[in-house]
C-alpha cells in the first residue's frame, strides 16, 4: 500500500507539474510583458482564485464541469471519454491546486530580472524574442526552477480537490495524503507511520532543493 501510493503520488504530481509549466509560463509572460492592462487583470484573477478558494471548492467545480451532466463532461462522455474518478481526474485536481504557486513564482522571477540588461541587449540589435530567451529566461532560470519544484511539492500534498473529483480509489487516485486519510479511518497505524514518514521526507527534500535554487538565483544576479 505504501509503495503503491508513493509511486502513484509521484506519477500524478509529475504529470500535473508538466501540464502546469507551459500554462504558468504563458501567464507569467502576459503578466510581466504585456501592455494590455485588461489581460494582466484577467491573469491576476486566474492565478489568484485557485490560491484563495478552498481545495474542496475547486474539486467541486471540476466535478460539475467534467461530470457527464456538465458542459465539457457531457461532450467528453458523448465521445466515450470518462474523466471523473479516474487517474486523470487526480492529475487535473493536483494541477489546478498547484498552478497558482508555480505561476506566481514564474511571475516574480521574471519581474526581478534587471531591465537594463534587456535594454542593452536590444540596443545591440537583439530582437525582443531573442532578448527574452537569452537574457530574461537565463537570468530567471533558478527562480523558474524553484517555481516548478514548488508546484510539484504542492501537488504531492494535494488532498481536498482530489478526494472530491477523483475519489479515494486504490491504485487510481489514492495518493499519499488520501492513503494517510484512509489509514486514520481504518486504524492502520503501521502504514500510517510509513506514509507520514514518506510525506515528511518528500516535503523536506522539496524545501531543501528549493532553498538551494533560491540562493543560486540570488548569486546569479548581474549587478
PLM segments and residue spans:
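Membrane-cytosol interface at the C-terminal ends of specific transmembrane alpha-helices
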Residues: 83-122, 135, 147, 208, ...
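Membrane-helix interface segments
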Residues: 34-42, 71, 86, 116, ...
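Periplasmic/extracellular loop-to-transmembrane helix junction in inner-membrane transport proteins
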Residues: 1-17, 34-36, 40, 183-189
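Transmembrane-helix boundary motif in ABC transporter permease subunits
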Residues: 15-47, 62, 75, 109, ...
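Membrane-interfacial helix termini and adjacent extracytoplasmic/periplasmic loops
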Residues: 59-95, 166-169
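C-terminal transmembrane helix and the adjacent membrane-cytosol boundary/short C-terminal tail
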Residues: 39, 107-123, 189, 193-223
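Interhelical loop and adjacent transmembrane-helix boundary motif
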Residues: 1-4, 163-205, 209
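Transmembrane alpha-helices
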Residues: 18, 103-106, 110, 114, ...
Amino acid at each position: 500500500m505504501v509503495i503503491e501510493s508513493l509511486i502513484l503520488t509521484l506519477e500524478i504530481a509529475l504529470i500535473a507539474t508538466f501540464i502546469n509549466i507551459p500554462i504558468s509560463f504563458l501567464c507569467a509572460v502576459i503578466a510581466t510583458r504585456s501592455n494590455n492592462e485588461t489581460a494582466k487583470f484577467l491573469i491576476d484573477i486566474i492565478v489568484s482564485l485557485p490560491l484563495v478558494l478552498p481545495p474542496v471548492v475547486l474539486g467541486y467545480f471540476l466535478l460539475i464541469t467534467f461530470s457527464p451532466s456538465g458542459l465539457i463532461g457531457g461532450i467528453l462522455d458523448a465521445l466515450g471519454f470518462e474523466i471523473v474518478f479516474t487517474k486523470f481526474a487526480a492529475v487535473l485536481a493536483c494541477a489546478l491546486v498547484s498552478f497558482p504557486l508555480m505561476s506566481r513564482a514564474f511571475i516574480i522571477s521574471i519581474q526581478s530580472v534587471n531591465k537594463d540588461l534587456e535594454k542593452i541587449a536590444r540596443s545591440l540589435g537583439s530582437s525582443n524574442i531573442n532578448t527574452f530567451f537569452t537574457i530574461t529566461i537565463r537570468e530567471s532560470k533558478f527562480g523558474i526552477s524553484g517555481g516548478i519544484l514548488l508546484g510539484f511539492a504542492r501537488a504531492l500534498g494535494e488532498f481536498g480537490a482530489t478526494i472530491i473529483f477523483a475519489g479515494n480509489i486504490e491504485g487510481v487516485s489514492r495518493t499519499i495524503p488520501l492513503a494517510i486519510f484512509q489509514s486514520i479511518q481504518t486504524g492502520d497505524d503501521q502504514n500510517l507511520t510509513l506514509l507520514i514518514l514518506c510525506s515528511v521526507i518528500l516535503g523536506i527534500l522539496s524545501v531543501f532543493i528549493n532553498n538551494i535554487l533560491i540562493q543560486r538565483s540570488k548569486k546569479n544576479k548581474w549587478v
